[in-house]
Regions:
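An amphipathic, aromatic/His-enriched active-site/gating alpha helix that lines ligand/cofactor pockets
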Residues: 1-32, 83, 87-97, 112-119, ...
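Surface-exposed interaction/gating patches
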Residues: 33-34, 41-107, 115-125, 129, ...
Length: 175
C-alpha cells in the first residue's frame, strides 16, 4: 500500500489529518475471530448518504480502551476479558474487536513501531453515549467484572487509555 500509486498521490493529504503517525503498535486479534468482522457490510454511497452535520447527527460511538500490561500477561488478560464481557453485551453495546501486541519483527521499518509495548486493546460499539453510560454502570454493578478488574489492575504498567470516537457517515465500524 505505502509503495503504491494511491499512497503516492494522497500521502500528503492523509498525513496532514494525523496527529501522530509515530504512535504505532503492531497488533493481532486477541483470540480467533476477535478482529473486525466487516463481512457483508457496504459503505453508503456519498450521493445517497445524508451528511451527519445536516439534520442527521450520528448517535453511535466507538470506545477504544488500551490496557498497558506487564510482559507475558496479554493472553490471560484477553481470555478473562472475553469471558467477563460476554455476559454484559447487549444490542446497544457490542465488542467490535479485540487485539493484543504482536511480538514480531516490524516488516515495514518506515513506520516505527513501539516494540517495547504489551497491550490489550478493546474496540466496542455503542448505540449512543447513553448506552455507553449504561454499560459502564453494568460493569460497576457486576461482581465478576469487579473481581476481574481489581486483579487486572495489578498487571497494568500504566493507566488505561480510553478513546471515544464518532463513526463517520462512511464508516463500516460501529454500524
Amino acid at each position: 500500500f505505502y509503495g503504491g500509486p494511491v499512497w503516492a498521490a494522497h500521502s500528503d493529504a492523509a498525513n496532514a489529518t494525523m496527529i501522530d503517525s509515530d504512535d504505532v503498535l503492531l497488533l493481532k486479534p486477541a483470540w480467533p475471530a476477535a478482529g473486525f468482522d466487516l463481512a457483508g457490510k457496504q459503505r453508503p454511497s456519498l450521493a445517497d448518504d445524508e451528511k451527519p452535520i445536516q439534520n442527521k447527527p450520528l448517535t453511535g460511538i466507538v470506545v477504544i480502551e488500551i490496557h498497558h500490561l506487564q510482559p507475558g500477561t496479554e493472553a490471560d488478560f484477553a481470555t478473562r476479558f472475553e469471558t467477563e464481557t460476554a455476559c454484559l453485551m447487549t444490542a446497544d453495546a457490542r465488542l467490535l474487536a479485540a487485539f493484543v501486541t504482536e511480538h514480531a519483527e516490524n516488516s515495514f521499518p518506515r513506520l516505527p513501531v513501539r516494540a517495547d509495548e504489551n497491550v490489550f486493546i478493546s474496540v466496542m460499539g455503542f448505540a449512543s453515549t447513553e448506552a455507553h453510560a449504561r454499560h459502564q454502570a453494568a460493569l460497576a454493578a457486576s461482581p465478576a467484572w469487579q473481581d476481574f478488574w481489581q486483579a487486572a489492575q495489578l498487571g497494568l504498567t500504566k493507566q488505561t487509555e480510553t478513546l471515544r470516537l464518532l463513526p463517520t457517515s462512511q464508516s463500516l465500524v460501529g454500524r
